[in-house]
């Protein structure tokens, strides 16, 4: 039946309207021309329920909306989209400006009253939509699935270790839906429709995003809503070494020394857990393990010894305090990340302070049987206490935070969902825990007087919005198997397409039980080598493993051994790509770009590309196909690996690669030019992972270095891949600090006109202190005689550049 329009702002430049149906009230709010919020609540509520969004920080803009009464519906039109609301049912239909259907709601939302728990009086809610038959949709975050498609899937949205769900799906049609509910939720796609369902809410609440029909447009809208990405320091784009765990400062320093001795580039090293001591002292955020503070044998500190260190022997330590360790790492031109958790043992000072204000969550977490409890990150006073203790490590000079177990770990039992946080029941807020936890650390660090470091946090969980708070996710404690590696590629793609640009895995996996924790096992060596190759093309490159495994490159062999040489070569390759990688990060921050791009982002019209779960674009130029199956080893029934070929370096088994249509491609290694729209079997020796460069690409390559800031970028190699027009913007700043937020950076645009074979280097835009004002560019017109992609290529022309525009023909 028809009903009256009950809410406001329906003419001219408007933001919100609300309509009442026989059942729910439908409220339409435009946050921008490309982002609209749809809220529905039962008609017996007099007003819209109040709600705090953990994720959305954007306020509605003043949007010009044209409102039209079409008889049975009211239509709202912005410059980017049209939304039509049925007057009888309140169902919404989303269309392009031309009138093409993007998405339609199916019927009214469902509201089922909760009874018998702390959320009694609220609702279980669900909303369904009708998609086109065969329409591809992606997203929902990090989930262990070898298929990036969401069609036909049933997925629970409840964050645990290795499983970080984001309530976002995007379509090949270039729209996205963000279901703004951080409680236990469910996604279902079947013949009846595509549905989100949440266990606790007072209304359905989602955002529809559509700008220009591209996934880039969707991601820009999501970041406008939840926060633009922040810039990580240059060093973070380099190579990180991590292991569970370095048990003394000297052991950590010795690993760094070995990397420098072997000339394996390195920018970051990680101190894992138990520097605080035993489990009862869990996450004290103080160095109380006597091995780190030269207190071995001191009765006052012996109580803090972890069980696995009680019989360790140590000679007089070289580094006698954590302060000395930090200074030493910095003196060797590296940086130090340290593990911190979202829980505290009963012996710690934070535990006592949090208990006093009622800010500990009373459920069982890890480590079990230790009395350790998570803190209530939803309580702002608890976040203050957390930083109060973490700030001591910050003052020591630590560069980055590893916020482990940020789901947090939870050994669930009946009734746990009824625990109340400062923001509501656990079942209603849990999926936002990592977001508020990391946000608290970021905001406290940013507010610290004299802060000159960019905040960088690596978190095991995540949520839409963490990109705004100096945080990236890793995929959790995964196993070292080929099967797991295969699923990690689509796992990462499903995460980043939700709008969070920075992600990585433990290179080599974490638990190496399947190969008996043996880095000399040929099967483990092949797996580690292939994973390291892939790691060179992740947004961040970090080696890791669990004890008793070791992850250092030199543990896999000596110089001259293939497992050592190939890993080192790819680390060196990563460093030569740093100008490309850092500029791509600049595109992420300034233009809402993405570093790791599922093929739908660039080839949405290519149906074959949409189905590829094992390839992606690294930046806008490079197509990457990780090798995720063993080619040269086999594993026996006892878990031991064996070589198939006596000399693995002589083998070249084929790997299938698909090159998307609509462009030509260059084999990165050989420079062979190949037309797109075809599958091919690429010979794949252990030294090579399939990488292709899109025709029209312009890529800056840097010098060989041992750490990211060792040499200035005053002599860059600029590779041009002919075959299409193209451009690239070189982004530069001082490499750390937040001056870039005030415009202190430079942009240098390179443009290639393929028809005229003309390269233009535009006038430099911007400035920052101590920037290069004069430099040399070595132009490489890539072709079959240019040399291998991983080497120094044959220079076609060298130009001197002082910031003024240069044009040259080839």
Where are these regions (language model features)?
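N-terminal accessory segment at the very beginning of proteins
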Residues: 1, 19-235, 242-244, 249-251, ...
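Bacterial N-terminal signal peptides that target proteins for export
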Residues: 1-7
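Bacterial N-terminal signal peptides
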Residues: 7-16
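Catalytic-domain carbohydrate-binding cleft regions of carbohydrate-active enzymes
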Residues: 99-688, 694
């Amino acid at each position: 039946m028809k009903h009256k329009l009950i809410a406001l702002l329906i003419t001219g430049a408007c933001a919100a309207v609300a309509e009442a149906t026989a059942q729910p009230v439908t409220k339409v709010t435009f946050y921008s021309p490309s982002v609209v919020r749809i809220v529905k609540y039962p008609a017996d509520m007099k007003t819209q329920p109040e709600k705090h969004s953990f994720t959305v920080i954007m306020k509605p803009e003043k949007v010009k909306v044209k409102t039209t009464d079409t008889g049975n519906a009211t239509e709202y039109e912005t410059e980017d989209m049209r939304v039509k609301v049925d007057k009888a049912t309140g169902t919404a239909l989303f269309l392009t400006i031309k009138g093409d259907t993007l998405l339609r709601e199916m019927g009214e939302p469902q509201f089922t009253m909760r009874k018998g728990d702390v959320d009694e009086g609220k609702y279980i809610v669900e909303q369904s939509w009708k998609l086109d038959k065969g329409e591809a949709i992606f997203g929902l975050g990090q989930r262990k699935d070898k298929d990036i498609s969401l069609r036909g899937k049933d997925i629970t949205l409840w964050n645990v270790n290795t499983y970080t769900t984001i309530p976002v799906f995007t379509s090949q049609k270039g729209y996205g839906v963000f279901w703004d509910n951080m409680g236990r939720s469910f996604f279902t796609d079947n013949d009846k429709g595509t549905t989100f369902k949440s266990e606790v809410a007072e209304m359905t609440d989602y955002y529809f995003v559509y700008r220009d029909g591209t996934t880039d447009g969707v991601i820009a809208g999501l970041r406008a809503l939840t926060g633009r990405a922040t810039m990580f320091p240059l060093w973070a784009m380099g190579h990180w070494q991590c292991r569970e765990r370095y048990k003394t400062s000297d052991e950590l320093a010795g690993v760094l020394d070995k990397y420098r001795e072997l000339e394996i580039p390195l920018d970051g090293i990680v101190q894992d857990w138990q520097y605080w001591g035993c489990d009862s002292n869990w996450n004290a955020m103080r160095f109380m393990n006597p091995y780190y503070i030269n207190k071995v044998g001191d009765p006052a500190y012996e109580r803090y010894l972890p069980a696995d260190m009680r019989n360790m022997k140590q000679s007089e330590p070289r580094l006698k305090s954590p302060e000395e360790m930090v200074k030493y790492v910095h003196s060797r031109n590296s940086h130090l990340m340290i593990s911190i958790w979202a829980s505290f043992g009963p012996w710690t000072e934070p535990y006592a302070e949090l208990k006093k204000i009622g800010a500990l969550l009373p459920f069982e977490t890890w480590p079990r049987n230790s009395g350790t409890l998570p803190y209530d990150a939803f309580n702002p006073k608890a976040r203050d206490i957390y930083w109060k203790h973490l700030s001591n490590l910050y003052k020591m000079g630590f560069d980055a935070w590893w916020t482990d177990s940020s789901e947090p770990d939870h050994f669930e039992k009946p009734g746990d969902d009824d625990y109340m946080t400062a923001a509501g029941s656990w079942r209603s807020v849990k999926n936002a825990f990592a977001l508020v936890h990391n946000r608290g650390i970021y905001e406290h660090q940013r507010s610290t007087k004299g802060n000159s470091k960019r905040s960088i946090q690596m978190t095991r969980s995540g949520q839409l919005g963490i990109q705004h708070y100096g945080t990236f996710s890793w995929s959790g404690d995964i196993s070292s198997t080929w099967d797991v590696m295969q699923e990690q590629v689509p796992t990462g793609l499903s995460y980043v397409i939700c709008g969070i640009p920075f992600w990585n895995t433990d290179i080599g996996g974490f638990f190496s039980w399947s190969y008996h924790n043996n880095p000399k096992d040929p099967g483990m060596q092949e797996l580690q080598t292939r994973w390291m190759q892939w790691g060179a093309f992740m947004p961040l490159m970090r080696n890791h493993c669990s004890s008793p495994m070791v992850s250092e490159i030199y543990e896999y062999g000596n110089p001259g051994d293939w497992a050592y040489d190939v890993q080192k070569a790819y680390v060196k390759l990563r460093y030569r790509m740093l100008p490309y990688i850092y500029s791509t990060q600049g595109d992420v921050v300034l233009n809402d770009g993405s570093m790791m791009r599922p093929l739908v982002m660039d080839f949405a019209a290519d149906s074959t590309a949409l189905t590829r779960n094992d390839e992606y674009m690294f930046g806008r130029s490079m197509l990457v196909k990780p090798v995720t199956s063993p080619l040269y080893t086999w594993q026996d029934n006892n878990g031991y690996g064996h070589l198939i070929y006596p000399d693995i370096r002589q083998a070249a088994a084929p790997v299938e690669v698909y090159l998307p249509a609509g462009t030509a491609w260059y084999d990165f290694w050989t420079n062979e030019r190949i037309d797109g729209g075809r599958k091919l079997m690429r010979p794949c020796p252990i030294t090579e992972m399939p990488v292709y460069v899109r025709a029209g690409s312009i890529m800056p390559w840097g010098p060989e270095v041992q750490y990211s800031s060792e040499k200035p970028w005053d002599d860059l190699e600029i590779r041009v891949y002919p075959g299409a027009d193209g451009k690239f913007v070189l982004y530069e700043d001082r490499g750390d600090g937040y001056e870039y937020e005030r415009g202190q950076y430079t942009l240098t645009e390179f443009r290639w006109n393929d028809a005229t074979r003309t390269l233009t280097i535009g006038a430099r835009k911007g400035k920052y202190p101590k920037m290069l004002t004069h430099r040399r560019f070595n132009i490489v017109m890539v072709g079959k005689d240019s040399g291998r992609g991983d080497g120094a290529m044959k220079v076609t022309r060298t130009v001197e550049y002082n910031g003024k525009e240069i044009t040259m023909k080839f």
